[in-house]
């Protein structure tokens, strides 16, 4: 079974999981930073400029990740516009500025002879500071990414333990807001 993404040449999720397992088997006391990111408004890029340009944005971001993060890093495309990375043998404190710079650096796609900017959002977490098991690391980084998306995109955020409760309550508020705006003939049932 393939372990690389055919479009970007990065690891796919299977390859990523295998590499991470190999790294962690060697040293359970290692510190690492997990990153989860995606391209802001990627559907708009595909709809506005076409899938060829969307693919170019994905390839560009993959190349940026490979050149920006060190050879010790494990980088993958999860699918769609989602990417994950594990920065091995480092801490959040050591990499915070580098992650911020990576997130905020300008990125462009070319369409009809013009350059058009595109942006990313990124969440990150540290093992073992933010989670007890490295398998939780990307989930924590994903919650941090979700928090960035809730507050305007094109930014990055470290994981905070409060994100778990905020994520749950945010989903509840969204359902409540939707139900308030429905005509009287609609009923919402919540299955237990």
Model-predicted regions and their roles:
Residues 1-18, 37-51, 59:
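Conserved nucleotide-binding and Mg2+-coordinating catalytic segments in signaling enzymes
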Residues 62-63, 94-112, 140-142:
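Alpha-helical scaffold within the catalytic cores of cyclic-nucleotide enzymes
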Residues 57, 84-102:
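Short helix/loop segment flanking the catalytic signature motif in cyclic-nucleotide metabolism enzymes
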Residues 1, 13-30, 62-70:
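Short regulatory alpha-helical coupling segments
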């Amino acid at each position: 079974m393939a372990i690389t993404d055919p479009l970007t040449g990065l690891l796919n999720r299977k390859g990523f999981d295998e590499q991470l397992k190999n790294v962690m088997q060697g040293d359970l006391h290692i510190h690492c930073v997990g990153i989860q990111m995606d391209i802001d408004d990627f559907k708009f890029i595909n709809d506005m400029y076409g899938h060829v340009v969307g693919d170019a944005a994905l390839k560009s971001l993959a190349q940026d990740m490979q050149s920006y993060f060190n050879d010790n890093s494990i980088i993958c495309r999860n699918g769609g516009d989602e990417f994950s990375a594990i920065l091995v043998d480092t801490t959040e404190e050591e990499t915070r500025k580098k992650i911020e710079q990576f997130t905020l650096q300008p990125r462009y796609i070319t369409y009809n002879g013009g350059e058009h900017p595109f942006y990313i959002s990124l969440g990150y977490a540290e093992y073992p500071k933010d989670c007890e098991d490295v398998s939780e690391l990307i989930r924590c980084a994903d919650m941090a990414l979700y928090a960035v998306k809730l507050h305007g995109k094109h930014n990055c955020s470290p994981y905070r333990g409060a994100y778990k409760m905020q994520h749950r309550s945010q989903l509840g508020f969204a359902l409540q807001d939707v139900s308030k705006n429905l005509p009287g003939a609609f009923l919402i049932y919540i299955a237990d």
